[in-house]
C-alpha cells in the first residue's frame, strides 16, 4: 500500500476544512502510517484569474504558508518527511511565475482545472458548468503537454478531470488521453489516480465516479514506461481516514486487470 501522498491542501484555499490546521493534517498522516507527504495547496496568482473566490490562497499568504510547512518539516523530521509545494494550473504567459514557485518549493503538481477558449475566456472543468467543445478538450491536453515540456510539474494531478464535463469517452477524449500519456511517459512525469471522488462515494456524497475514468487508465496501462501514483487530494480529515478504502473503490472502478498493468512509482517517483 502506498504510504506517501503528494496532494494535500490546507484551509487557506477556502474550500478545505477550516477547522484543521497544517499540523492537524500532519498528525492524521502519521496516524495512518505515512512516511512522506507534500503540502501542495492551490497556488497563489499574481493576477486575478480565479473562477471562484474560494479557489486558492491569497498571494499575501504564500510566505506564511511556506514557513508553516517548513516549521512542521523540522518539528516532525523524526516521524515523517514533509515537503513544500503547490498545485498549479498552466496558462499561457504564466511560465515565469510557475517556475518561480517551483524554485521555492519541493513539489509542483499540475491540476489543470480550466483553459482559455477561443474568446480568451476561462472555461472550467466543473460538472454542468458550461458546454465544452472538442477544441476545449484538446486545449486541455495542449496545456498539460506544454507545461511538462517546460519542466513545470513534478506530477500531473487528476489528468482525467476533463471527464467531469462529458459522459462520453469518444475519439476526442481518447486523443486527449494519448497526448497526456505520451508526453508524461517521454518526460518521466507520473500521473495521479485521484481519490477524491472514491471518498465521496464512500461518504454517500455522490453515486457516480467521473474520475478516475476507466477508459483513460486503460489507455495509460498500454504505456510501458508511464509512471502512476495515487493522490488523496486531501482537503478533509475523512479523506485521510478513508484512504485504504478509497483505493479499493478506485481499483474496483478502474478494474483490477487494468491496475495490474500500471507502473506505480515509489516515494522518489521511480518505478522499482
Regions found by a protein language model. Give the residues of each.
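Short low-complexity, flexible loop/linker segments enriched in glycine and/or proline
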Residues: 51-55, 206-214, 243-247
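Conserved active-site loop/cleft motifs that coordinate metal ions or position small ligands
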Residues: 39, 192-194, 227-233, 260-261
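Short acidic/His/Gly/Ser-rich catalytic and metal-binding motifs that mark active-site loops
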Residues: 46-49, 117-121
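An N-terminally biased module of ancient metal coordination in phosphate/nucleic-acid-related enzymes
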Residues: 1-92, 100-102, 165-181, 188, ...
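Mid-to-C-terminal alpha-helical segments outside catalytic/metal-binding sites
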Residues: 226-227, 241-272
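Domain-core and long-helix interface of multi-subunit machines
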Residues: 104, 109-115, 121-223, 234
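Short acidic/histidine-rich active-site segments
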Residues: 42, 159, 226-241
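A short helix-to-beta-strand connector/capping loop
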Residues: 78-81, 104, 152, 224-226, ...
Amino acid at each position: 500500500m502506498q504510504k506517501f501522498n503528494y496532494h494535500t491542501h490546507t484551509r487557506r484555499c477556502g474550500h478545505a476544512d477550516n477547522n484543521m490546521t497544517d499540523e492537524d493534517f500532519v498528525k492524521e498522516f502519521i496516524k495512518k502510517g505515512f512516511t512522506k507527504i507534500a503540502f501542495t495547496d492551490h497556488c497563489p496568482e499574481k493576477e486575478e484569474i480565479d473562477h471562484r473566490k474560494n479557489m486558492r490562497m491569497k498571494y499575501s499568504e504564500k510566505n506564511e504558508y511556506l514557513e508553516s510547512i517548513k516549521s512542521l518539516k523540522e518539528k516532525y523530521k523524526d516521524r515523517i518527511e514533509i515537503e513544500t509545494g503547490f498545485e498549479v494550473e498552466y496558462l499561457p504567459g504564466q511560465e515565469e511565475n510557475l517556475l518561480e514557485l517551483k524554485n521555492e518549493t519541493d513539489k509542483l503538481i499540475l491540476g489543470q482545472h480550466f483553459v482559455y477558449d477561443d474568446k480568451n475566456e476561462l472555461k472550467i472543468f466543473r460538472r454542468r458548468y458550461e458546454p465544452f467543445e472538442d477544441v476545449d478538450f484538446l486545449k486541455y491536453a495542449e496545456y498539460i503537454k506544454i507545461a511538462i515540456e517546460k519542466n513545470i510539474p513534478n506530477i500531473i494531478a487528476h489528468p482525467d478531470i476533463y471527464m467531469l464535463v462529458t459522459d462520453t469517452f469518444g475519439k476526442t477524449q481518447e486523443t486527449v488521453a494519448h497526448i497526456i500519456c505520451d508526453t508524461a511517459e517521454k518526460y518521466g512525469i507520473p500521473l495521479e489516480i485521484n481519490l477524491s471522488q472514491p471518498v465521496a462515494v464512500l461518504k454517500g456524497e455522490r453515486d457516480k465516479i467521473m474520475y478516475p475514468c476507466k477508459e483513460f487508465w486503460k489507455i495509460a496501462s498500454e504505456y510501458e514506461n508511464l509512471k502512476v501514483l495515487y493522490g488523496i487530494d486531501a482537503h478533509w480529515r475523512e479523506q485521510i481516514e478513508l484512504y485504504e478504502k478509497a483505493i479499493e473503490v478506485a481499483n474496483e472502478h478502474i478494474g483490477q486487470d487494468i491496475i495490474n498493468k500500471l507502473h506505480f512509482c515509489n516515494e522518489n517517483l521511480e518505478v522499482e
